[in-house]
Amino acid sequence: MLAAQLVIAASMVLPLAAQTSSQAMASHAEAAQAAEKRGDFFTAVREYEYLARRLPRNAELQSNLGVALYFNHQWEQAIAVFHKALTLDANLLAPHLFTGLAWYQLSRPDAAVPELETAVRLRSSDVLARTWLGYAYVAQSRYEAAAKEFQEVTRLAPDNIDAWYALGQAWLEIGRRRTLALLKAAPNGGRAWQLAGEQLQLQGDRNKALADYEQANARRPDIPELRHAVEELGGKAVTAPVTQAAVNPQEDTLYAQAHEAEQKSRAAFEHVLSAAPDSYRAHQIMADAYVLQQQDDKAIAAYRTVLQLKPDLPGIHEAIGSALLRSGKSAEALTEFQAELKLQPRSASVNTLLGQTLLLLGKNDEAEKTLRSALLMDRPPADAHRLLGKLELHRNNYQAAAENLNRYLATEKNDATAWYLLSRAYRGLNDKQQMDHALSQFAKISEDAKARTQAQNELARLNSQTHVDDEAGKRSP
């Protein structure tokens, strides 16, 4: 969140002196402004409430009260006050902007987006409105729209390192999604091998990169840059003509989109590293890179540097906790997720990770409460249902286990382990037909996994969400 005083200076108007000669009113107005300047929003709220009761039809005064409530973390009350301000003057910027921010703080991006879009329409050059509209789009998984907003912010405010980082993250996610689409459209095609080779080359693994480029070149000898990539790494390129059947236009399109997104992401991150090499965002970029390279110890160290520079940055304790879980250090991870929960109490993903960690530590009742809370929040991860399914299976509550696992598998159809757990639930229910179906799905998906190519496995690892082994906690001291 940006510093309160920066926002106040840009958005608050206090027209009271022109509207009344009352010395008492002026005194309360001055007290409100003084409280804002020193960050005492509790007092500012009290002063603005006094003024608003005496000038209930003043839209700007209602807006000022709403902003004070917002910075006092009274988001629901702020929204109600902003609504009143907008009924008096629908074209005020601050009520739309801060209503959107309040909904975002309440983890309600669907409600935040329309307000922030209106704020941008009212003032297209407002950096704050565009930045948070971008974040709200990210929360909705609308990454292309988010990238457009962050790109505009970097144009309006070239020194805004947060916007450059967010832009890189948006393009990274766009590239990830295009890569997954490529793997679905042509899992063993030349472009998948090419993309895997490029990723390995970026990591500095020339030998594996060459092997992947040779596989790609063998499948698509018609692509000049593939021949060049093979030869540049010391290999011998294939120059035989490719058959028309080997050319997949969709494959080429998806590769081009994934490649372009990756380049744009890298350019944004490189800008951060060049413009602000000692910033918390630069250290975050390095930490994220260590995660992709499966170097969790280095990632944790880099993330801790981020926290030294900006202790209240959301997502960092979560990232450390996830890395600790992957290392089998569940007790330490619990501390990190609890710290993250203080920063993001309404985050479904944080609550789900906390619930998973509690399960690993054998704190089943706490885990259940946390996971059920996650399911009541905005866009809960499907994993919450999987974890509840495992918990209910452990309790021999087979019906509840089957219900939760089926909800999980409705979206995560290729999780072989979940199908196996579901078969156990149906066995407990003496439902042989459903048990056999679940086992057949388990066997099929397991065989499909064995048949996956090296390129598929490499790209899936690089482009997947960070995965935590549920059994990791059992190995912790």
Regions found by a protein language model. Give the residues of each.
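Structural marker of alpha-solenoid helical repeat scaffolds
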Residues: 54, 88, 122, 156, ...
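Helix-start (N-cap) detector for alpha-helical repeat units in TPR-like alpha-solenoids
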Residues: 25, 59-60, 93-94, 127-128, ...
